[in-house]
Design a protein with these regions (language model features):
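N-terminal helical capping/dimerization or prosegment-like subdomains
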Residues: 1-79, 86-90
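Active-site metal-coordination/substrate-binding segment of hydrolases
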Residues: 77-146
Length: 146
């Protein structure tokens, strides 16, 4: 099989990751519709928008506990669990790079969630998107659970 993920697609994935990193999503007091705080709810809303834009079917729990995006058909579900919360950034003055920007240096992305778990979640999502773009038919559902 030829390269499935092109350089342009990789750049697009990094831009999406930067977009998601820009949403501060550390645990805050619960609010109505945001059981883990407004930041985490905002990250869930943004992730669902991203998944919609990429062609996934989405569902978001109205109470804000979870959402998912899926592709494929059939009775079986292959689940990919991702989380969008991060630890607080602490003293912003001690950061070399803005923790909520998603700074790319030498092909590495710096920012809250870039390694745990926003970055890996976007990588997995784009791997499936690349297969979708190649016309691959999934005979079971692949569900990304957030």
């Amino acid at each position: 099989m030829d390269k499935i993920i092109t350089e342009d697609e990789q750049k697009a994935a990094v831009k999406i990751l930067e977009r998601l990193i820009s949403v501060p999503s550390y645990n805050q007091p619960a609010e109505e519709g945001a059981p883990f705080g407004k930041g985490i709810r905002n990250a869930l809303d943004e992730m669902m928008k991203i998944c919609d834009e990429l062609g996934f079917k989405t569902y978001e729990d109205p109470d804000g506990y979870y959402g998912y995006a899926e592709v494929g058909s059939g009775d079986k579900i292959f689940g990919v669990i991702c989380h969008l919360d991060t630890v607080p950034a602490g003293d912003l003055g001690k950061w070399k790079h803005d923790p909520f920007k998603g700074t790319v240096i030498n092909d590495a992305v710096y920012g809250r969630g870039s390694q745990d778990d926003k970055g890996p979640g976007i990588a997995a999502l784009y791997a499936v998107k690349a297969l979708m773009d190649q016309g691959y038919h999934f005979n079971q559902r692949i569900r990304f659970i957030y």
